[in-house]
């Protein structure tokens, strides 16, 4: 029912230079771009850009806020369709504090040495050998635990990613080292299943941007908190094409980073399993207040019931009060006679 083609561009070196460009397998990032990052958002007070190579992994870092693929749509292709260009060997990494030195997401932060805090080889994490384009943002004091602080940090940091995206769009096909096809295949007659992914929606740094114009972008996206955390149905290919820009804090609670959705293992497994018919993915936010949690979980139950599925997977990320609605989603689906399995992605403490 659909195909996206990931067009891979190999990067082996990242340097600073007078302009953002790609020459051979070297990515150059424009010197002075830091000033534009700071100027873009009133709440951003300082910004520092580092290029972390594998021999520098044992470097101290403020809390890691996100790990993002660098990808862009080709031509007029929209998210979840057509061709997507992606850089291999390099990722964007956002870190940050407020002006008082308080980590963004202090109660669940991950400051420390990068090589000691990164869980290598996981879908949302950097892979060993990759170069990190690491931006450390300082936001206005005491906005680190409000929605506007983390949102400003992510929005400002995307200026750099977007400049790289624009360069990628202009490259000729000689830069493409591999074309990878991801297919969404429906299998009538097999067990029809849906994946329900509970994402954070309590506010502050527990939020997500849904369906940006560019993979893991900012422009055009809506925050699920602003949507009331109600279920949003997307295609499996939209998930794998970067339809979620994760704003969640990352620390002991192990929320899912933007890159996790780009390589979402459950979606990939279900697409490849010839015994199941994956009809779609439902994203549902986890509100702060219990009454709102049950409001939302009832919507989940009705949504899944309307799909006439043979079974459902419900996933949540990390741990905390999101397990209240996680349990309620499972209950609401199960009480309608639909077999349901719950999965939780939790950290090593």
Regions found by a protein language model. Give the residues of each.
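Long, compositionally biased, glycine/small-hydrophobic-enriched stretches that function as flexible linkers
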Residues: 1-224
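Small-residue-enriched flexible segments
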Residues: 188-287
């Amino acid at each position: 029912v659909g195909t996206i083609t990931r067009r891979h561009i190999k990067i082996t070196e990242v340097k600073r230079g007078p302009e953002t460009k790609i020459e051979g397998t070297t990515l150059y990032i424009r010197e002075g771009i830091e000033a534009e990052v700071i100027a873009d958002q009133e709440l951003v007070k300082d910004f520092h850009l580092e290029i972390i190579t594998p021999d520098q992994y044992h470097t101290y870092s403020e809390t890691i806020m996100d790990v993002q693929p660098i990808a862009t749509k080709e031509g007029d292709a929209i998210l979840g369709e057509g061709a997507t260009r992606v850089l291999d060997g390099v990722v964007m990494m956002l870190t940050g504090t407020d002006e008082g030195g308080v980590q963004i997401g202090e109660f669940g932060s991950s400051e420390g040495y990068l090589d000691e805090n990164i869980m290598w080889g996981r879908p949302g994490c950097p892979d060993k050998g990759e170069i990190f384009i690491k931006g450390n943002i300082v936001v206005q004091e005491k906005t680190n635990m409000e929605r506007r602080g983390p949102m400003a940090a992510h929005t400002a940091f995307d200026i750099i990613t977007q400049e790289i995206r624009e360069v990628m769009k202009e490259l000729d096909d000689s830069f493409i080292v591999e074309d990878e096809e991801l297919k969404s295949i429906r299998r009538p007659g097999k067990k029809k299943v849906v994946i329900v992914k509970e994402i954070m929606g309590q506010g502050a740094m527990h939020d997500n941007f849904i369906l940006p114009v560019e993979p893991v972008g900012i422009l055009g996206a809506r925050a699920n908190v602003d949507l009331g955390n109600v279920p949003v149905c997307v295609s499996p290919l939209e998930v794998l094409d970067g339809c979620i820009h994760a704003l969640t804090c990352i620390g002991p609670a192990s929320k899912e980073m933007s890159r996790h959705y780009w390589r979402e293992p459950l979606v990939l497994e279900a697409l490849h399993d010839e015994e199941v018919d994956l009809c779609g993915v439902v994203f549902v936010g986890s509100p702060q207040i219990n009454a709102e949690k049950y409001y939302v979980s009832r919507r989940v139950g009705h949504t899944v019931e309307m799909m006439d599925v043979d079974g459902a997977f419900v996933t949540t990320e990390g741990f905390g009060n999101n397990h209240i609605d996680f349990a309620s989603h499972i209950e609401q689906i199960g009480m309608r006679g639909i077999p349901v399995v719950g999965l939780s992605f939790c950290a090593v403490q």
